[in-house]
Amino acid sequence: MISFEDFLLRPSKVVDPFNRFVAKIDPFLTLVEFCQVIGPKPLAVVSQRPDDKIRGVDINDMAIWLMSSDTVPGTMIVLENNQTGVYAAAYYFNLYDMRARAFQRNLCIAYLCSEKPTKETLNLFSSAMKKLVSPVLICNRRLFIRHVTDIVKFSDSVDETTLKQYYTLNGDSQKLSDGSRFNVVFEQTRLLKSKFLTKRFQEMAFDDDICCGHNAENMNEAEDIICSFRVPSIPLSPVETLTPCAYSSIIPKLRQLCSELCSSGSPNRNSTHGALFCGHRPIATTSPAATTTLPWNTDSGKSDNDKNGEETLKEVTGHLGDVIFPLLCGEDLVVCGAEQRKSTVEDMLGKLSRVVPRESARNVEENIKIEKDPNRIGNGLGGLLCNRNETGKLARWRNVLDMNRSALKTFTYDGSLLAGLNKKRKFPSDRSLVLFIIAYLTNICQLAFICRYMFIKSPNSIEKALGDQQKLSSDDERILINLLMGIDFEKFNQLKVSSKDGAKPSRTINL
C-alpha cells in the first residue's frame, strides 16, 4: 500500500501500478483459532457497531492471514496486509487439550484497523492482553492437569494383561490396535504429568484469578477422553470447555478494550499529533504540517515542588548535558539522597522527568516514586533513599546523581549536540530552565528528522546518511538513534547498540 508520505518524501520508490488505496475500516477485535481440521476460523468479533458487524473486510481471510505468521505463543507482533491496507496488532497464545494435535490448540487475539497502531495503542493492547489472557491460561492449565492426573490414575488401575486378553478374545481386528494406542496415550500422559506438576506451576497465581481450581476428581470424564481416541473423526471440544471458568469473561473484556483502543487511536483525542513530548509540549511531530490540539499551557514546566521554593536544577547548569545525556541515549539514571534530602530528590526527579522525551504526553504526569529497596527501581529514571555510607546499593548503576555529595557518577560524554547545555548560565527559576531545555531538545529533534528521511538512502549508519555535512561522535549518534526509536521504533530499533558494546569508564563530576 502506498502512503502519501511515499509520494512526497520517497520519489525514487516505484509507484504501485495497482493503485491499492483502500477504504477505511472500523477498528475491531477478533478471536481466532487455528483448527486442526478446517484451519483458521474466527471465534468472536467485537467492534463499535451494533451487532458487531464488520464492513469492508472479509473476516475469514483476515483469520487466515493472522494465523499464517510464524510466531511463538505469548508474543505480540504488528502485521501489515499490503493488499487490503489493514494493520493488525496480534497476541498469540495456546490452550492445552488432551485430544488436540501435540495437546495444543493455537489461538490469537488481534486488533485490526486501517492506520498503523501508535505506541500508545500498542502499549495499551499489550498490557490489556496480559491481564485478559492470564486467567484464561491458568484455568486451562489447571483443568488440563486435572485431566492428566485422572488419566494417569485410570491407566494405573488397568491391568495390561487383562487389556490384552480382552482384545485378543474379541475377533474385531480394528480393536486389536486399540490396546497399543491406549498404551501410547498413557505413556505420553505420564510425561505430561511430570512436566506440568512442578513447584513453579503450582505456585502460579494472578490477581484476576477466577478459576475454581478444578481439584475434584472426575474419572468418568477421564474415561470418556480415553475412549475418544478410538474414533479420530470425533470433533474437538469447543474452546469454551477448555477454560470454563474464564471464557465467559473474554467477550466483555474485549468489548471494553475495543472502546479504549478506538479512543486512544482517535485523531480527536485529548493528546497531540506528535511523536515525542517534553512537559506536555511536542518536540518532534510525525509530519511538518501536523498541529497540536493540546493548549500550550505556560505551567507545563512547573512542578508542585516549585511552590516550596526548591530550585535544585539551577545548581547544575554547568553540567546539564552530562546529567541528561544518559536519559537521552536510553540509559538508566538513579537520583539518590538521604531521608533528610527526600524533598530535594523528589524535586530533581520531577523536573528531570519533564525534560525526558516520551512517546505520549500523558506519561509526563506520571510521578516517579522514591524507593528504599534498590531492587524495586525500574528502567529509566528512578529515585532511591540511601545514606552517604550506603554506596553499595548503587554499585549496579552506571549513572548516579548523588544529592548527598552533590556529585554525578557517569561516563564521559564526547559529543557536540549537548555542548550548549554544559555552559554555566543563570536562570531566574527552574521553570525557565526546564523550558529552555525543552526548546534545546526541539532543535536536536530537527536533526533527528533529517536523519530519519536520509536514512532511507543510507540505512547502514546515521553518520553515512549525513555524509560530509556534519560529523557526529558515537555519543551523539546514540542520542539520535534513541530519538528515532521514539519516533518509529520498528524501523530504527535495528540501529540500537548495546550499552555493553564499547562501554567507557565512568567518572565522577562534582556539581
From Swiss-Prot:
> Which biological processes are named by the entry's GO terms?
autophagy
Domain (uDENN FLCN/SMCR8-type): residue spans on this chain: 20-168
Q: Which UniProt keywords apply?
A: Autophagy, Cytoplasm, Guanine-nucleotide releasing factor
In this chain, composition skew of type Basic and acidic residues spans 301-310
The reply to whether Glycoprotein figures as a keyword in the UniProt entry is: no
Domain of life according to the entry: Eukaryota
Q: Where is the dDENN FLCN/SMCR8-type domain?
A: 434-488
cDENN FLCN/SMCR8-type domain sequence ranges? 282-425
List the subcellular locations.
Cytoplasm
Chief site of localization:
cytoplasm
For this UniProt entry, the molecular function terms from Gene Ontology, in alphabetical order, are: guanyl-nucleotide exchange factor activity
The region called Disordered is annotated at 288-310
A GO-annotated cellular component: guanyl-nucleotide exchange factor complex
Family indicated by similarity: Belongs to the SMCR8 family.
Known role? Part of a complex that has guanine nucleotide exchange factor (GEF) activity and regulates autophagy.
In Swiss-Prot or TrEMBL terms, this protein is called Guanine nucleotide exchange protein smcr-8
Protein species of origin: Caenorhabditis elegans
What gene is this protein a product of? smcr-8
